[in-house]
């Protein structure tokens, strides 16, 4: 049995983990869902949320202790201040709970979708005699804390959302490159498929974004760019699906720029509603800034629906689309270039169609979850020597 450990599962952004678990089961892999702590009941609006909570074992609050070797691991962390190491005793308790649960249900390997504290829990579980483990890095290393060498030292292998993260791991941690797999999270490209849309009118453009309302998502730059495009005579409309701490600031900006009739905030939406939004839009916007973004699943969903993307150069986005082929890559915080992209797409419907068709082809060839999940599974089997699929032997895959 393969355990999949995701911190605070399920949250609104966790649908791709559920897709991965479904793909693993279709491949004949018995899967146990694991998590650190139970999130609030309203933290995920997707239809799968209730079933996900029912199937998940939460290691916090823990049920037992006896992890003195794990305590030794914790106290040896070089980059974590002593005060935080002492507070980390709770992680030891969680590691012991995880160890006992793995023994109870027969988990042979744990794959952790985080390089933050959940990675410490898996490492200490292994020290206690628990199963082997692997990790996925979903963003820049600094976002996930410190002591990455300790987290990764015992890991059988590591996957990451893009080649740039593999380079970070090798450079900053010294982990062997041959044990690191750049791999996309993926999505169901059959479900996220284009609608039958006409070429559209010259001068009109419906934009969409699916993202949390956080400062790091750079919504303020996209909204300011909408104002510039409208001032150039284009009929641009913009719909954002997502919720977060920046909502009040975004609402004020919309008012200040006199865009209340053009920019709509939908709040959090489930998967079917996101699909509907994408299918009625002309183009997708990702204006993220700073660190932390890796291979945005929302960008994959939009490309799979045949939408051209106007997208920040951030994380793995240059590996996900080629500027001028599947969309437009824009320097971070560049309102003028965002606006220029909007204006061009508004005035050239044929360009929208050609970029969108290319985006769809790339999504199908690179981002389908069945292929990305199989690639991860084969990599884990290669580096653990385990045959996790019922009735199947190990396979090989290159990093």
Feature map (PLM): residue ranges:
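Short hydrophobic beta-strand element within catalytic cores of glycosyltransferases
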Residues: 308-311, 321
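Conserved donor-binding/catalytic core segment of Leloir-type glycosyltransferases
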Residues: 196-227, 239
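Carbohydrate-associated surface elements
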Residues: 164, 186
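Conserved acidic donor-binding segment of nucleotide-sugar-dependent glycosyltransferases
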Residues: 323-324, 328-335, 344-349
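Short alpha-helical donor nucleotide-sugar binding micro-motif in glycosyltransferases
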Residues: 268-269, 276-281
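Acidic anion/phosphate-binding donor-loop and adjacent secondary structure
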Residues: 146-147, 170, 178, 187-203, ...
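Nucleotide-activated donor-binding/catalytic signature segment of Leloir-type glycosyltransferases, i.e.
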Residues: 251-269
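Acidic donor-binding loop of glycosyltransferase active sites
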Residues: 279-293, 307
């Amino acid at each position: 049995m393969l355990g999949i450990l995701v911190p605070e599962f399920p949250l609104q952004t966790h649908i791709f983990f559920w897709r991965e678990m479904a793909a693993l089961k279709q491949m004949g892999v018995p899967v146990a869902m694991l998590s650190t702590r139970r999130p609030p009941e309203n933290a995920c609006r997707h239809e799968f949320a209730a079933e996900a909570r029912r199937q998940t074992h939460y290691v916090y609050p823990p049920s037992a202790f006896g992890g003195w070797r794990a305590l030794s691991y914790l106290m040896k962390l070089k980059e974590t201040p002593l005060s935080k190491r002492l507070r980390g005793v709770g992680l030891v308790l969680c590691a012991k709970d995880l160890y006992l649960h793995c023994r109870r249900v027969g988990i042979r390997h744990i794959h952790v979708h985080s390089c933050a504290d959940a990675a410490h829990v898996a490492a200490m579980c292994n020290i206690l005699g628990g199963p082997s483990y692997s990790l996925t890095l979903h963003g820049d290393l600094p976002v996930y804390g410190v002591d990455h060498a300790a987290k990764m030292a015992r890991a059988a292998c590591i996957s990451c959302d893009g080649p740039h993260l593999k380079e970070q791991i090798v450079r900053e941690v010294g982990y062997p490159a041959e044990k690191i797999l750049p791999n996309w999270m993926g999505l169901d490209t059959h479900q996220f498929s284009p609608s039958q849309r006409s070429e559209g009118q010259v001068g009109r453009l419906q934009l969409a974004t699916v993202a949390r309302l956080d400062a790091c998502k750079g919504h303020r730059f996209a909204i300011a760019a909408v104002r510039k495009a409208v001032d150039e005579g284009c009929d641009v409309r913009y719909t954002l699906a997502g919720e977060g701490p920046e909502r009040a600031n975004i609402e004020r900006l919309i008012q200040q720029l006199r865009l209340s009739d053009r920019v709509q905030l939908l709040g959090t939406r489930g998967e079917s509603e996101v699909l509907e939004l994408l299918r009625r839009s002309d183009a997708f916007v990702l204006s993220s800034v700073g660190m932390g973004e890796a291979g945005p699943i929302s960008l994959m969903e939009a490309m799979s629906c045949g939408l051209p993307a106007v997208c920040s150069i951030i994380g793995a986005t240059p590996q996900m689309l080629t500027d001028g082929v599947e969309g437009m890559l824009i320097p971070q915080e560049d309102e003028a270039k965002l606006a220029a992209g909007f204006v061009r797409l508004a005035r050239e419907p044929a360009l929208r169609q050609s970029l969108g068709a290319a985006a769809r082809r790339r999504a199908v060839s690179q981002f389908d979850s069945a292929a990305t999940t199989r690639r991860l599974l084969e990599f884990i089997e290669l580096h653990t020597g385990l045959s996790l699929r019922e009735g199947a032997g190990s396979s090989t895959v290159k990093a």
